[in-house]
UniProtKB/Swiss-Prot annotation:
<dbReference type="Pfam" id="PF00889">
    <property type="entry name" value="EF_TS"/>
</dbReference>
<feature type="region of interest" description="Involved in Mg(2+) ion dislocation from EF-Tu">
    <location>
        <begin position="80"/>
        <end position="83"/>
    </location>
</feature>
<dbReference type="InterPro" id="IPR014039">
    <property type="entry name" value="Transl_elong_EFTs/EF1B_dimer"/>
</dbReference>
<protein>
    <recommendedName>
        <fullName>Elongation factor Ts</fullName>
    </recommendedName>
</protein>
<dbReference type="InterPro" id="IPR036402">
    <property type="entry name" value="EF-Ts_dimer_sf"/>
</dbReference>
<dbReference type="GO" id="GO:0003746">
    <property type="term" value="F:translation elongation factor activity"/>
</dbReference>
<keyword id="KW-0251">Elongation factor</keyword>
<dbReference type="InterPro" id="IPR001816">
    <property type="entry name" value="Transl_elong_EFTs/EF1B"/>
</dbReference>
<dbReference type="InterPro" id="IPR018101">
    <property type="entry name" value="Transl_elong_Ts_CS"/>
</dbReference>
<dbReference type="InterPro" id="IPR009060">
    <property type="entry name" value="UBA-like_sf"/>
</dbReference>
<keyword id="KW-0963">Cytoplasm</keyword>
<comment type="function">
    <text>Associates with the EF-Tu.GDP complex and induces the exchange of GDP to GTP. It remains bound to the aminoacyl-tRNA.EF-Tu.GTP complex up to the GTP hydrolysis stage on the ribosome.</text>
</comment>
<keyword id="KW-0648">Protein biosynthesis</keyword>
<comment type="similarity">
    <text>Belongs to the EF-Ts family.</text>
</comment>
<dbReference type="GO" id="GO:0005737">
    <property type="term" value="C:cytoplasm"/>
</dbReference>
Length: 281
């Protein structure tokens, strides 16, 4: 049997909002499989915030560069928001992004290309800096949007520039995972369906009735995770699909990056802990 470590319990607690003992019990029952534990906790109603997965932790910036029908979205990280606004850091990030869109290099290739520059910048600024990831979007019509330095979106499709720009803004705010409801993978649909059936049965419904109830819930689920199924943020009474149809536009692809997605930030030390650490030192 796999060992349930304190680190696993801590991660599950952060991702679900459930109590420490509840998390430990769920991990024991799931043989230390954290994803299975979350699924089981959702079924039982124990998870209060399972969507909290991927704590936003690292600082830095998202840079977008477009060239010849290709857009590059680049994430460069640092340790503090102060350095993220430093002119040397922003110039470095812009230089890497320009090289990325020109060559469509992988993140590993960019890291190798700029390692010497990065090391020199780390020595100058005094913080660790990392070229974390890069993604590319190609299309005859591209629209990009950055929310501050922290969120970047590029949308590829057909239509006027203003409409596609508004769609990019919607993606930044609403975080869709797929373009259309039909794009949601079958395994994702089946996994969510199993969770919803069990939730309905836990409400005391016979399985046959529970499965019928789930049809509506699954339609809502695929709509919520897909761009065209979501309520348009600027006109909430209409879906994005309806807006696109009205404007004679379409979306074929999009990429959304947010600084620090999936990076867990070390817990900040309290003042009392700092004092204790100083006394020990």
């Amino acid at each position: 049997m796999a060992t349930v470590t304190a680190a696993l319990v801590k991660e599950l607690r952060e991702r679900t909002g459930a109590g420490m003992m509840e998390c430990k019990k769920a991990l024991v029952e799931a043989n230390a499989d954290i994803e299975l534990a979350i699924e089981n906790m959702r079924k039982s109603g124990a998870a209060k915030a399972a969507k909290k997965a991927g704590n936003v932790a690292a600082e830095g910036a998202i840079i977008i560069k477009e060239e010849n029908g290709v857009a590059a979205l680049l994430e460069v990280n640092c340790q503090t928001d102060f350095v993220a606004k430093d002119a040397n850091f922003t110039a470095f990030a812009a230089e890497v992004a320009a090289a990325a869109v020109a060559s469509q290099a992988t993140v590993e290739e960019l890291q190798a290309q700029f390692e010497e520059t990065r090391v020199a910048l780390v020595a100058k600024i005094g913080e660790n800096i990392n070229i974390r990831r890069v993604q590319y979007v190609a299309g005859s019509a591209l629209a990009s949007y950055r929310h501050g330095e922290k969120i970047g979106v590029v949308v590829a499709g057909e239509g006027d520039a203003e409409t596609l720009k508004h769609i990019a803004m919607h993606v930044a705010a609403s975080k869709p995972e797929y373009v259309n409801p039909s794009d949601v993978p079958a395994d994702v649909v089946e996994k969510e369906k199993a969770v919803q059936v069990e939730i309905a049965m836990n409400e005391g419904k016979p399985q046959e009735i529970a499965e019928k109830m789930v049809i509506g819930r699954m339609k809502k689920f695929t709509g919520e995770v897909s761009l065209t199924g979501q309520a348009f943020i600027m006109e909430p009474k209409k879906t994005v699909a309806e807006i696109l149809k009205e404007k004679g536009a379409s979306v074929s692809n999009f990429v959304r990056l947010e600084v620090g997605e999936g990076i867990e930030k070390a817990a900040e030390m309290s003042f009392a802990d700092e004092v204790a650490a100083v006394q020990k030192g």
